[in-house]
Amino acid sequence: MKKAHMFLATAAALGVAMFPTQINEAARGLRNNNPLNIKEGSDGGAQWEGEHELDLDPTFEEFKTPVHGIRAGARILRTYAVKYGLESIEGIIARWAPEEENDTENYINFVANKTGIPRNQKLNDETYPAVISAMIDMENGSNPYTYDEIKKGFEWGFYG
């Protein structure tokens, strides 16, 4: 038996599911468990909680789980609120996705329309998870995460 066939037979016998096309076709943020596409820090300094040990993507952070990635995003949003007073969709997205690199206005409109939250309304504990969910959708073209996963990551990052 050829090595490749033997490997596949062994994997099947062990109950290992292999879906390489699904993994490879997933958006980069989903593959990296970084659904908000947080970029690597320029200083190479402190590690995020739950950051993956293997740094295979030189541009974007990689996390052990999606909830760790959502937590990191919520941590950044907390900094935006506390340090910069950015607590609306418009304020957050203007900083998160600056015009030099993004269609910021389209991003703001997408999140506002998806959530039904006015772009200048101050966010709260009930509205942040919906905004994060819409941002994940915008960043990746889809959002496979449940409300509970997003809320857990938000609360852990914003208040933890």
From Swiss-Prot:
Q: Organism's domain of life?
A: Viruses
Q: What is its main location?
A: virion
Q: How does it sit in the membrane?
A: Single-pass membrane protein
Bilayer-spanning residue ranges: 7-23
Q: GO terms for CC?
A: membrane; viral inner membrane; virion membrane
Give UniProt keywords alphabetically.
Capsid inner membrane protein, Membrane, Transmembrane, Transmembrane helix, Virion
- Any idea where this protein resides? Virion membrane
> Does Transmembrane helix appear among the keywords?
yes
Query: Has keyword Transmembrane?
Result: yes
Which protein, by its recorded name, is this?
Answer: Protein P5
Species of origin reads Pseudoalteromonas phage PM2
Task: List the top taxonomic levels of the source.
Answer: Viruses, Varidnaviria, Bamfordvirae, Preplasmiviricota, Tectiliviricetes
- This chain is encoded by the gene named V
